[in-house]
Curated annotation (Swiss-Prot):
Gene3D superfamilies tied to this protein: Thymidylate synthase/dCMP hydroxymethylase domain
Protein's organism: Afipia carboxidovorans (strain ATCC 49405 / DSM 1227 / KCTC 32145 / OM5)
Subunit-level organization: Homodimer.
Alphabetized HAMAP family for the sequence: Thymidy_synth_bact
Location in the cell: Cytoplasm
Pathway the protein contributes to: Pyrimidine metabolism; dTTP biosynthesis
Native organism taxonomy: Bacteria, Pseudomonadati, Pseudomonadota, Alphaproteobacteria, Hyphomicrobiales
Any Gene Ontology biological process: dTTP biosynthetic process
Protein name as it appears in the record: Thymidylate synthase
Catalytic activity, EC: 2.1.1.45
Function: Catalyzes the reductive methylation of 2'-deoxyuridine-5'-monophosphate (dUMP) to 2'-deoxythymidine-5'-monophosphate (dTMP) while utilizing 5,10-methylenetetrahydrofolate (mTHF) as the methyl donor and reductant in the reaction, yielding dihydrofolate (DHF) as a by-product. This enzymatic reaction provides an intracellular de novo source of dTMP, an essential precursor for DNA biosynthesis.
Pfam families named in the record: Thymidylat_synt (PF00303)
GO MF annotation: an example: thymidylate synthase activity
Enzyme class of the recorded protein, top EC level: transferase
Active site per the UniProt annotation: 146
């Protein structure tokens, strides 16, 4: 995945020093874009080991419309714990917006259901969009959405996805985001009888925290390895019917994990 290594190099060489909400400090670039063709393999970073289980369970949690960390904790995933309140609640974050966006007239809009239906019935639509950025709810969210809007595109029997990420923790968060949205694209492609196409990742503020710089430099000393293959149970035809056991990552041979502290 040279695309990710190139982004690390770009930030380290050209990034601007910026202050941030956490008080940690960052090197930051704006408006970067990466593109991954899923025909070349599943874009799971190989220059450090990623926890596939956490990526899958987080996406299933989003798709369930859940906003409490209990499901994640019950499955050994702790990535949202720092932001949860005493009851495990996060406020109206991703799952709420994806599955039950509240309209001013009181309607609840299920963006994922609408998206899948539109891909099936009107694949040339330019409105194949899901947004998690709800200005009316942002102040009630434990963490406003970083990966905040995505759009699908159908051409020549292939389904592609572009993600806009307003804020990107490039060392810790972005590898998760790449794999998560590539997985979502493959799932939706399966239930709409399409082949996976390209995942396009567009960034607003893409940054390395000041306490991740040494880790990024270490990662750049590692050569990317062949991408793994993701197998999905072909019997699942409902986007909300997937379970963790329906996914199998094959031939994943990453370099060792690199530890870094999350900025909260």
């Amino acid at each position: 995945m040279h695309q990710y290594q190139d982004l690390l190099e770009h930030i380290l060489s050209d990034g601007a020093e910026k202050h941030d909400r956490t008080g940690t400090g960052t090197l930051s670039v704006f408006g970067h874009q990466m593109r991954f063709d899923l025909a070349a393999g599943f874009p799971m970073l190989t220059t450090k080991k990623l926890p596939f289980k956490a990526i899958v369970h987080e996406l299933l949690w989003f798709l369930a419309g859940d906003t409490n960390v209990r499901y994640l904790q019950n499955n050994g995933v702790s990535i949202w714990d720092e932001w949860a309140d005493a009851n495990g609640d996060l406020g109206p974050v991703y799952g709420k917006q994806w599955r039950s966006w509240q309209a001013p007239d009181g309607r609840s809009i299920d963006q994922i259901t609408n998206l899948v239906q539109m891909i099936r019935t009107n694949p040339d639509s330019r409105r194949l969009i899901v947004t998690a950025w709800n200005p009316a709810d942002v102040e009630q969210m434990a963490l406003p959405p970083c990966h905040c809007l995505f759009q699908f595109y159908v051409a020549n029997g292939r389904l592609s996805c572009q993600l806009y990420q307003r804020s990107a923790d490039v060392f810790l968060g972005v590898p998760f985001n790449i794999a998560s949205y590539a997985l979502l694209m493959m799932m939706i492609a399966q239930v709409t009888d399409l082949a996976p196409g390209h995942f396009v990742h567009t960034f607003g503020d893409a940054h390395l925290y000041s306490n991740h710089l040494d880790q990024a430099r270490l990662q750049l000393t590692r050569a990317p390895r062949a991408l793994p293959t993701l197998r999905i149970n072909p019997a699942v035809r409902d986007i909300f019917g997937f379970r963790y056991e329906d996914f199998k990552l094959e031939n994943y041979d990453p370099h060792p994990h690199i530890k870094a502290e999350v900025a909260v």
